[in-house]
């Protein structure tokens, strides 16, 4: 990607979505804490019920205003018909430059034990991850939003760290947080079905500049009060029920190679519900083969030739086993 290309501000595009979420907090069953001189905190499921609609909107915020997220009663997994569909005309920036949960945030030196992965457009304002050097992108934002998969609000040390890294005052930061066990939390995680395909494309070395459009769909997983089960269901929705189509400005050989490299079937750990795999590795997330974190089925279409290349397969039985 050219460093001279004018790119949109993901925080500016997401800002009206954030304000709409805050304005509709009551009907979405969220709470908002906003004190003068402090960051704004949106509780979307930690100590409130939240909602699926809140999760859908949070997913669009995570995409930096560069994508749409819809929920409809159609999809490839018949037993669980409600499907989350994600589309972006700038999938690299939307998914990797904004939605990807790549910012590790911890209460360093504190006693809270807080840790969460930050996602959303605020990442691009801080640009502390090496990924942004590869993307040649940094968002010079005046207001930022960050989404945390967390059961608690970030402590003061994390709030200060984020504001400082992004170069904005505390009151210009909005944190939206919800655990995976919640309605909103599970919804926004499944809405990463397109993002995991982009992350996999990056990890296998495909030229990201050649990815020009993308769409993904996965079944809406029911929430579960247990974190491991909830995490398992959201992963299984994508790993065994997710379908993605990428449109690439590349020749067939490259498109075919990408299609063959992307799906979760390339992983040695494919074939069991994620919670069972997690237990098999004694809860060591990083011991699991990283190739597993991919959509079940992938279609890569070359816009140069018009040919499409398909790889992987849906496994509805494992989705059913996980969701039941």
UniProtKB/Swiss-Prot annotation:
<dbReference type="InterPro" id="IPR003209">
    <property type="entry name" value="METHMP_CycHdrlase"/>
</dbReference>
<protein>
    <recommendedName>
        <fullName>Methenyltetrahydromethanopterin cyclohydrolase</fullName>
        <ecNumber>3.5.4.27</ecNumber>
    </recommendedName>
</protein>
<dbReference type="GO" id="GO:0018759">
    <property type="term" value="F:methenyltetrahydromethanopterin cyclohydrolase activity"/>
</dbReference>
<dbReference type="GO" id="GO:0005737">
    <property type="term" value="C:cytoplasm"/>
</dbReference>
<dbReference type="GO" id="GO:0046294">
    <property type="term" value="P:formaldehyde catabolic process"/>
</dbReference>
<comment type="pathway">
    <text>One-carbon metabolism; formaldehyde degradation; formate from formaldehyde (H(4)MPT route): step 3/5.</text>
</comment>
<dbReference type="Pfam" id="PF02289">
    <property type="entry name" value="MCH"/>
</dbReference>
<comment type="similarity">
    <text>Belongs to the MCH family.</text>
</comment>
<keyword id="KW-0554">One-carbon metabolism</keyword>
<dbReference type="GO" id="GO:0006730">
    <property type="term" value="P:one-carbon metabolic process"/>
</dbReference>
<comment type="function">
    <text>Catalyzes the hydrolysis of methenyl-H(4)MPT(+) to 5-formyl-H(4)MPT.</text>
</comment>
<keyword id="KW-0378">Hydrolase</keyword>
<keyword id="KW-0963">Cytoplasm</keyword>
